[in-house]
Amino acid sequence: IMPRDYMRVAEPAGMMPTVDNILLFRCIQVVRKLAQRKSKAGVFCNISAFSLLDEEFFPQFVEYMQHNTDLAQHLIFEFSQATVNGAGHVERASLEALAALGFRFSMDQVTDLRFDAGSLHDRNFRFVKVSAATMLEGTHTAGDIHAADLKELLKRNGIQLIVDKVEHEREVVDVLDY
């Protein structure tokens, strides 16, 4: 089941913390197996804004992570650009608690290239995922960074660009330029 399919039902029903908990548990299993194999690979684990705000789920989640900081080198928590941009005091405090434990973040579902890379880095974001379509369209407005310059901007700020949703062979060739 793809996230877009279950999220339409889970979000209005207030079930996203439960869904995130299940996904987190599975991600931790994968990370533990990678660690046994001495792999340096990372696993991206999506967390919804609903979970960051959940007064029952999130404190327990942070407490678990406090006891499992060894996961920080392999587990990257991922948030949509909408969640990052819409983060209020509670969400920011939640992210700060995880960052203080050494966990890194990724911003995905990026549709607007107008963001402050330095601010993202300061909040422990180390990855930004942009779709191939967004990169190849190269859409920008006056004064904003062009998609072709995004990789260098992010690199200067200690953030790695990941181009995702590459679905056609021609796109592979085109995105290699980034």
Where are these regions (language model features)?
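Short, contiguous acidic/charged loop-to-helix segments that flank catalytic cores in large enzymes
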Residues: 10-14, 18, 52, 135-141
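Structural preference for long, well-ordered alpha-helical segments in enzyme cores
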Residues: 5, 9-10, 23-31, 61, ...
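Active-site core of bacterial EAL-family cyclic-dinucleotide phosphodiesterase domains
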Residues: 1-9, 46, 163
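Short glycine/proline-enriched coil/turn segments at helix->beta-strand junctions
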Residues: 11-12, 37-40, 101-103, 124
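Residues at alpha-helix caps and immediate loop-helix transition turns in enzyme cores, especially N-
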Residues: 2, 56-58, 87-91, 116, ...
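Conserved acetyl-CoA-binding loop-helix of GNAT-fold acetyltransferases
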Residues: 19-22, 143-149
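Catalytic core of bacterial c-di-GMP phosphodiesterases, primarily the EAL and HD-GYP domains
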Residues: 15-90, 165
